[in-house]
Protein backbone atom coordinates (compact mmCIF):
# COMPACT_ATOMS: atom_id res chain seq x y z
CA UNK A 1 0.00 0.00 0.00
CA UNK A 2 1.47 3.35 -0.99
CA UNK A 3 -0.04 6.28 0.87
CA UNK A 4 1.07 9.89 0.77
CA UNK A 5 1.44 11.75 4.04
CA UNK A 6 0.91 15.49 4.34
CA UNK A 7 3.58 16.21 6.94
CA UNK A 8 5.72 13.56 8.60
CA UNK A 9 5.95 14.25 12.33
CA UNK A 10 9.40 13.85 13.84
CA UNK A 11 9.20 12.13 17.20
CA UNK A 12 12.58 13.57 18.12
CA UNK A 13 16.11 13.70 16.80
CA UNK A 14 14.91 13.26 13.25
CA UNK A 15 12.98 10.01 13.74
CA UNK A 16 9.79 10.15 11.69
CA UNK A 17 6.73 8.13 12.63
CA UNK A 18 4.19 9.01 9.97
CA UNK A 19 1.82 6.11 10.56
CA UNK A 20 1.09 3.80 13.47
CA UNK A 21 -0.72 0.50 13.16
CA UNK A 22 -2.59 -1.03 16.07
CA UNK A 23 -3.37 -4.74 15.90
CA UNK A 24 -6.11 -5.49 18.41
CA UNK A 25 -8.80 -3.12 19.57
CA UNK A 26 -9.71 -4.11 23.08
CA UNK A 27 -9.70 -1.65 25.96
CA UNK A 28 -5.95 -1.06 25.77
CA UNK A 29 -5.90 -0.83 21.98
CA UNK A 30 -8.56 1.86 22.18
CA UNK A 31 -6.52 3.75 24.77
CA UNK A 32 -3.47 3.58 22.52
CA UNK A 33 -5.55 5.05 19.71
CA UNK A 34 -6.52 7.94 21.99
CA UNK A 35 -2.92 8.51 23.08
CA UNK A 36 -1.55 8.55 19.54
CA UNK A 37 -4.18 11.11 18.56
CA UNK A 38 -3.20 13.20 21.54
CA UNK A 39 0.60 13.03 21.42
CA UNK A 40 1.23 12.40 17.72
CA UNK A 41 -1.73 14.11 16.02
CA UNK A 42 -0.07 14.21 12.61
CA UNK A 43 0.46 10.46 12.50
CA UNK A 44 -2.05 8.35 10.62
CA UNK A 45 -3.50 5.58 12.78
CA UNK A 46 -4.56 2.32 11.17
CA UNK A 47 -6.40 -0.17 13.34
CA UNK A 48 -6.89 -3.83 12.56
CA UNK A 49 -9.61 -5.58 14.55
CA UNK A 50 -11.11 -8.95 13.77
CA UNK A 51 -14.40 -7.59 15.10
CA UNK A 52 -14.56 -4.51 12.87
CA UNK A 53 -15.05 -4.18 9.13
CA UNK A 54 -12.35 -2.12 7.35
CA UNK A 55 -13.64 1.35 6.46
CA UNK A 56 -10.46 3.05 5.26
CA UNK A 57 -10.77 5.67 8.00
CA UNK A 58 -10.23 4.02 11.36
CA UNK A 59 -10.22 0.32 10.58
CA UNK A 60 -8.02 -1.26 7.93
CA UNK A 61 -7.10 -4.68 6.67
CA UNK A 62 -4.19 -6.46 8.32
CA UNK A 63 -2.13 -5.85 5.17
CA UNK A 64 -2.79 -2.10 5.29
CA UNK A 65 -2.14 -1.89 9.02
CA UNK A 66 1.13 -3.78 8.61
CA UNK A 67 2.44 -1.15 6.18
CA UNK A 68 2.68 1.44 8.96
CA UNK A 69 5.99 2.84 10.21
CA UNK A 70 5.35 1.22 13.58
CA UNK A 71 2.93 -1.56 14.49
CA UNK A 72 1.73 -2.13 18.05
CA UNK A 73 0.61 -5.65 18.92
CA UNK A 74 -2.18 -4.87 21.41
CA UNK A 75 -3.38 -8.46 21.69
CA UNK A 76 -3.78 -10.86 24.64
CA UNK A 77 -0.56 -12.53 25.78
CA UNK A 78 -1.68 -15.96 24.59
CA UNK A 79 -2.30 -14.54 21.10
CA UNK A 80 1.00 -12.67 20.81
CA UNK A 81 2.98 -15.25 18.83
CA UNK A 82 0.23 -15.84 16.28
CA UNK A 83 -0.29 -12.10 15.83
CA UNK A 84 3.42 -11.58 15.26
CA UNK A 85 3.66 -14.43 12.77
CA UNK A 86 0.62 -13.13 10.88
CA UNK A 87 1.99 -9.64 10.48
CA UNK A 88 5.67 -10.27 9.78
CA UNK A 89 5.23 -11.29 6.12
CA UNK A 90 3.26 -8.07 5.52
CA UNK A 91 5.40 -5.36 7.11
CA UNK A 92 7.99 -3.13 5.49
CA UNK A 93 11.61 -3.93 6.30
CA UNK A 94 11.94 -0.84 8.52
CA UNK A 95 8.59 -1.18 10.29
CA UNK A 96 9.11 -1.24 14.06
CA UNK A 97 7.18 -3.92 15.93
CA UNK A 98 6.09 -2.66 19.36
CA UNK A 99 5.32 -5.21 22.06
CA UNK A 100 3.14 -3.86 24.90
CA UNK A 101 2.33 -7.17 26.61
CA UNK A 102 2.14 -7.50 30.39
CA UNK A 103 4.91 -10.12 30.46
CA UNK A 104 8.32 -9.68 28.93
CA UNK A 105 10.37 -12.90 29.19
CA UNK A 106 7.79 -14.75 27.09
CA UNK A 107 7.31 -12.11 24.40
CA UNK A 108 10.98 -11.20 24.00
CA UNK A 109 11.84 -14.87 23.55
CA UNK A 110 9.24 -15.03 20.77
CA UNK A 111 10.55 -11.84 19.16
CA UNK A 112 14.11 -13.18 19.15
CA UNK A 113 13.00 -16.50 17.71
CA UNK A 114 10.49 -15.26 15.13
CA UNK A 115 11.20 -11.64 14.18
CA UNK A 116 14.54 -12.18 12.46
CA UNK A 117 15.94 -8.86 11.23
CA UNK A 118 12.70 -6.96 11.86
CA UNK A 119 13.29 -4.07 14.28
CA UNK A 120 11.33 -4.33 17.52
CA UNK A 121 11.02 -2.90 20.99
CA UNK A 122 9.54 -4.71 23.98
CA UNK A 123 7.69 -2.41 26.36
CA UNK A 124 5.12 -2.56 29.12
CA UNK A 125 3.03 0.49 29.97
CA UNK A 126 2.38 0.12 33.71
CA UNK A 127 -1.12 1.58 33.50
CA UNK A 128 -4.35 1.04 31.63
CA UNK A 129 -7.69 2.60 30.70
CA UNK A 130 -9.01 2.76 34.28
CA UNK A 131 -5.89 4.51 35.58
CA UNK A 132 -5.99 6.94 32.66
CA UNK A 133 -9.64 7.73 33.33
CA UNK A 134 -9.14 8.15 37.07
CA UNK A 135 -6.33 10.61 36.41
CA UNK A 136 -8.48 12.51 33.89
CA UNK A 137 -5.87 11.93 31.21
CA UNK A 138 -2.92 13.16 33.27
CA UNK A 139 -0.08 10.80 32.32
CA UNK A 140 2.61 12.45 34.44
CA UNK A 141 4.30 9.77 36.48
CA UNK A 142 2.83 6.92 34.45
CA UNK A 143 5.65 4.40 34.01
CA UNK A 144 6.60 2.67 30.78
CA UNK A 145 9.10 -0.16 31.01
CA UNK A 146 11.49 -0.54 28.10
CA UNK A 147 12.82 -4.07 28.38
CA UNK A 148 14.62 -4.97 25.18
CA UNK A 149 14.99 -3.80 21.59
CA UNK A 150 16.77 -4.34 18.29
CA UNK A 151 16.66 -0.70 17.19
CA UNK A 152 19.62 1.48 16.25
CA UNK A 153 20.74 3.29 19.40
CA UNK A 154 19.80 6.71 18.06
CA UNK A 155 16.27 5.53 17.26
CA UNK A 156 15.84 3.93 20.68
CA UNK A 157 17.11 7.08 22.39
CA UNK A 158 14.76 9.24 20.34
CA UNK A 159 11.73 7.10 21.19
CA UNK A 160 12.61 7.09 24.89
CA UNK A 161 13.04 10.86 24.86
CA UNK A 162 9.71 11.32 23.10
CA UNK A 163 7.94 9.29 25.79
CA UNK A 164 9.55 11.43 28.47
CA UNK A 165 8.46 14.59 26.68
CA UNK A 166 4.89 13.28 26.76
CA UNK A 167 5.13 13.05 30.55
CA UNK A 168 5.77 9.34 31.01
CA UNK A 169 8.45 7.96 33.32
CA UNK A 170 10.69 5.63 31.32
CA UNK A 171 12.12 2.68 33.27
CA UNK A 172 14.75 0.48 31.67
CA UNK A 173 15.20 -3.10 32.87
CA UNK A 174 15.71 -6.61 31.57
CA UNK A 175 12.74 -8.86 30.77
CA UNK A 176 13.68 -11.02 33.77
CA UNK A 177 13.78 -8.06 36.15
CA UNK A 178 10.44 -6.86 34.82
CA UNK A 179 8.70 -10.19 35.25
CA UNK A 180 10.08 -10.73 38.76
CA UNK A 181 8.84 -7.30 39.85
CA UNK A 182 5.52 -7.78 38.09
CA UNK A 183 4.88 -11.12 39.79
CA UNK A 184 5.33 -9.46 43.19
CA UNK A 185 3.23 -6.40 42.35
CA UNK A 186 0.64 -6.56 39.58
CA UNK A 187 0.06 -10.32 39.76
CA UNK A 188 -0.20 -10.23 43.56
CA UNK A 189 -2.65 -7.32 43.32
CA UNK A 190 -4.73 -9.27 40.81
CA UNK A 191 -4.62 -12.38 43.00
CA UNK A 192 -5.81 -10.54 46.11
CA UNK A 193 -8.34 -8.60 44.06
CA UNK A 194 -9.84 -11.76 42.63
CA UNK A 195 -10.07 -13.31 46.12
CA UNK A 196 -11.82 -10.25 47.54
CA UNK A 197 -14.19 -10.09 44.56
CA UNK A 198 -14.98 -13.82 44.73
CA UNK A 199 -15.66 -13.48 48.45
CA UNK A 200 -18.30 -10.83 47.83
CA UNK A 201 -16.58 -8.22 49.98
CA UNK A 202 -17.84 -4.71 49.21
CA UNK A 203 -17.57 -1.15 50.41
CA UNK A 204 -19.66 -0.07 53.41
CA UNK A 205 -20.70 3.25 54.90
CA UNK A 206 -18.08 2.95 57.66
CA UNK A 207 -15.04 2.09 55.54
CA UNK A 208 -11.62 3.03 56.87
CA UNK A 209 -9.28 4.89 54.55
CA UNK A 210 -7.05 1.81 54.24
CA UNK A 211 -10.02 -0.37 53.25
CA UNK A 212 -10.94 2.22 50.65
CA UNK A 213 -7.45 1.92 49.17
CA UNK A 214 -7.81 -1.86 49.13
CA UNK A 215 -11.12 -1.65 47.30
CA UNK A 216 -9.66 0.83 44.82
CA UNK A 217 -7.09 -1.82 43.94
CA UNK A 218 -9.70 -4.58 43.81
CA UNK A 219 -12.00 -2.61 41.54
CA UNK A 220 -9.15 -1.77 39.17
CA UNK A 221 -8.33 -5.44 38.49
CA UNK A 222 -11.38 -7.57 39.26
CA UNK A 223 -12.70 -7.45 35.69
CA UNK A 224 -9.38 -8.56 34.18
CA UNK A 225 -9.81 -12.28 34.74
CA UNK A 226 -8.37 -13.24 31.35
CA UNK A 227 -5.30 -11.07 31.83
CA UNK A 228 -4.86 -12.50 35.34
CA UNK A 229 -4.81 -16.05 33.95
CA UNK A 230 -2.48 -15.12 31.09
CA UNK A 231 0.01 -13.45 33.43
CA UNK A 232 0.05 -16.54 35.67
CA UNK A 233 0.52 -18.82 32.67
CA UNK A 234 3.25 -16.86 30.89
CA UNK A 235 5.19 -15.19 33.72
CA UNK A 236 7.63 -17.80 35.08
CA UNK A 237 7.87 -16.10 38.47
CA UNK A 238 4.19 -16.09 39.45
CA UNK A 239 4.08 -19.63 40.83
CA UNK A 240 6.87 -18.91 43.30
CA UNK A 241 5.10 -15.73 44.45
CA UNK A 242 1.87 -17.66 44.90
CA UNK A 243 3.69 -20.30 46.97
CA UNK A 244 5.20 -17.59 49.19
CA UNK A 245 1.78 -15.99 49.61
CA UNK A 246 0.15 -19.27 50.62
CA UNK A 247 2.92 -20.01 53.14
CA UNK A 248 2.59 -16.53 54.62
CA UNK A 249 -1.20 -16.83 54.75
CA UNK A 250 -0.83 -20.05 56.72
CA UNK A 251 1.56 -18.44 59.18
CA UNK A 252 -0.76 -15.47 59.76
CA UNK A 253 -3.76 -17.78 60.27
CA UNK A 254 -1.83 -19.76 62.88
CA UNK A 255 -0.98 -16.55 64.73
CA UNK A 256 -4.70 -15.86 65.09
CA UNK A 257 -5.25 -19.28 66.64
CA UNK A 258 -2.70 -18.79 69.41
Predicted regions and their residues:
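A short helix->loop->beta-strand "cap" motif at the edges of active sites that frequently abuts
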Residues: 41-42, 92-95, 116-118
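An accessory alpha-helical subdomain
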Residues: 169-258
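Phosphate-coordination loops involved in phosphoryl transfer and adenosine-cofactor binding
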Residues: 17-19, 94, 141
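Rossmann-fold dinucleotide-binding core
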Residues: 103, 107, 111-169
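ADP-ribose/adenylate-binding Rossmann-like module
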Residues: 91-107
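NAD(P)+-binding Rossmann beta1-loop-alpha1 motif at the extreme N-terminus of oxidoreductases
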Residues: 2-62
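Rossmann-like NAD(P)-binding element
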Residues: 63-91
Amino acid sequence: MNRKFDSPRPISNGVNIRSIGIVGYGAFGKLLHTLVGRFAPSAEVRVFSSREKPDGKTFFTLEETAQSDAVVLAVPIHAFEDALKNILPLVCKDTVIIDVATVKVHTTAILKRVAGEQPYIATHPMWGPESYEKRNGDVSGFRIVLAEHSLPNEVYTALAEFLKQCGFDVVEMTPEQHDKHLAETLFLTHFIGQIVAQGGFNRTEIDTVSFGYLMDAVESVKHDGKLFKDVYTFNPYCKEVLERFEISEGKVSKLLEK
